Amino acid sequence: MAGAVSAVDQPLKIITGADDFGASLKDAMVTHLRSLGIDVEDTGVSSYYSAGSEVGRRVSASSSSEVRGLVCCGTGVGVAMFANKFPGVYAATCLSVEDAVNARSISNCNVLAFSGIKTSPETALEIFDAWIKTPFKSPCPASGSEPWSSVISSFLDNSLSEMSQIGKSTAGDSTTKKIDETTASCVICCLAKNREFTPVDIMPGGSMKIVRETPTSAIVRFKAGSVEPAHHHTFGHDLVVIKGKKSVWNLSKKERADLVDGDYLFTPAGDVHRVKYHEDTEFFITWDGHWDIFLDEDLETAKKAIEEEA
């Protein structure tokens, strides 16, 4: 692929993701960036909201300013919207070099969003090159290609610390009621102890309590020996095991995860997965959108498959 991108001087890692409409452009960029020696962490292809949120989550969780993101969907707008749901992520859809320079200069953009429909690989390289080389507060089209005035420069300096706090949880003041540490050590456990659980009819042995409707979050319990037949969801989900032991087979990726107390697992949207509970297990789960479930096999088929693997 032809293009103007040159090797980056400083250590740099780019986390990438796309939906079906942006997959080809994303793959082309991944191949080229790796050829330049840039460390690329590719999260693959999923729905635009899952792709954007997964890249945003990983960039947000990084402690390094040199970890950035690159996301692609049909328009470049959807992936940017969901990447921006995470603190410290400043995603911008850039259709031109000018967009990229403005986004870096003004907003310190750290996630670049491309349109797989509108942007060619050659143009994407030019946009990326401008984006990666433009420092914060540098002259840009919005400044008339001149240095920012001292007033605006001061504003931009202050904006970094102020923007980074948006979306973060804030500590309560002196009037906030404190949790009694003698009865509960974490908020999730406190919620679980004081809520009624509803049986999950489609999953024998399971019960759940929804603690937020949209995006859906819930505390879920399964009895030892329970099996979740292969199924999938419209939205990806994160879960943390509070107590117990379970095995999750991601049939889409042909991977297995054995989880115990404190373990975390993310399952992308649409991935078909099967679950076996080895002990009474309780976990917290949150979806990227509204909860739903679609079965891909019956219970007996699932049990037989697990027995054959054992």
UniProtKB/Swiss-Prot annotation:
SUPFAM superfamilies linked to this entry: Ribose/Galactose isomerase RpiB/AlsB, RmlC-like cupins
UniProtKB keywords: Acetylation, DNA damage, DNA repair
One Pfam family per UniProt: Cupin_7
Record GO cellular component, one term: cytosol
One term of GO molecular function: isomerase activity
InterPro entries reported in the protein's UniProt record: ChrR-like_cupin_dom (IPR025979), DRT102 (IPR012100), RmlC-like_jellyroll (IPR014710), RmlC_Cupin_sf (IPR011051), RpiB_LacA_LacB (IPR003500), RpiB_LacA_LacB_sf (IPR036569)
Residues in Cupin type-2 domain copies: 219-282
Name listed for the protein in its UniProt record: DNA damage-repair/toleration protein DRT102
